[in-house]
Regions:
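Mid-domain alpha/beta scaffold segments of enzyme catalytic cores
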Residues: 1-307
Length: 307
């Protein structure tokens, strides 16, 4: 397993705790991702220095990837669905599969999959969530109207979810927030322009999550909120790879701290630790409900310390 591949994991960090999300782009890749998720400590140690956190609670989890076009290309959509369902149930039993996704609608990249195929199998993917009682990890790009119509028809088929890497308008934001069990995920792509920051300001803290979406969606020097970034790491070009440095031009999991700083800055939040604890609690509520008590305790402790 290459270091490059490992650095494509998405990471959620809070203090001394972090969870790495592994995704697959197909049924076969999801099988491989589940195998990776079962390794836990074997790979986590390699990240500890880069993430600069103490390894107190380190886990790898799988979000079961469900690409719409793969249903068609399989030649037998129902058999493909049953294969995904069987894999999900296996992962649930092992305590590793925590969500269905990433799935949704992307009308910016129609060369990958036409909209009618996307809509047909996005609807089908809710059946996976219903059968497994898992939350959903969702993607919406330039498709808010169709996305929300499908969501509304299937709102009772899943326990909750997050629409990640949100880049939509204030109207799109408000449509998503109208679904009681939906959170909005923010990363570097959500923070490019001043208009994006205005939209993010309107996301209630209690309905927000943050992510890197590494190796994509880094916060660049041209981004509107760059002045809010405080945390920096040394980086080198990949040709001069150094395990003590980031790879220049590649978004890496530890950079979720920069997302936290920009969102806090644009929302005028000064207690970044309390903000971080709230986001962690939001994440637990959807994907790790077994950790909610610990998250609530951390949030309460943060409030007490600020008084």
């Amino acid at each position: 397993m290459s270091f490059n591949f490992l650095c494509c994991w998405k990471c959620i960090i809070h203090g001394n705790r972090f969870v790495v999300q592994v995704t697959g782009g197909s049924l076969e890749e999801s099988k491989e991702a589940l195998a990776i998720a079962e390794t836990d400590g074997l790979f986590i140690g390699g990240f500890s220095a880069q993430l600069e956190c103490t390894q107190l609670d380190a886990r790898l989890v799988l979000f079961l990837e469900t690409l719409s076009l793969e249903f068609e290309e399989s030649g037998d959509p129902e058999k493909h669905f049953q294969g995904l369902l069987a894999l999900a149930k296996e992962g649930i039993q092992k305590g590793k599969v925590v969500a269905i996704g990433e799935c949704g609608l992307d009308y910016d990249r129609l060369h990958f999959c036409p909209p009618e195929v996307q809509k047909k199998y996005f609807e089908k993917q809710f059946e996976l969530a219903y059968a497994t009682k898992l939350p959903m990890f969702l993607h919406m790009r330039a498709a808010a109207e169709d996305f929300c119509e499908i969501m509304e028809r299937n709102i009772n088929k899943f326990t909750g979810g997050v629409t990640h890497s949100f880049t939509g308008s204030a109207e799109d934001r408000d449509k998503l927030l109208s679904f009681h069990n939906m959170y909005i995920g923010v990363n570097g792509c959500s923070l490019k322009m001043a208009e994006n920051l205005d939209v993010v300001r309107g996301i209630p803290v209690e309905r927000m999550m943050i992510e890197t979406d590494s190796p994509y969606c880094e916060i660049k020097s041209t981004h509107a909120g760059i002045n809010f970034v405080k945390s920096l790491w040394p980086s080198k070009k990949k040709e001069k790879y150094d395990k003590e440095c980031l790879v220049k031009g590649r978004n890496e999991p530890c950079l979720v701290r920069q997302v936290l700083e920009v969102v806090a800055g644009c929302k005028g939040i000064t207690d970044i630790d309390l903000f971080s604890a709230t986001l962690y609690q939001n994440t637990c509520r959807v994907f790790f409900p077994q950790d909610l008590d610990a998250a609530a305790d951390a949030l309460l402790a943060g409030r007490n310390e600020s008084q």
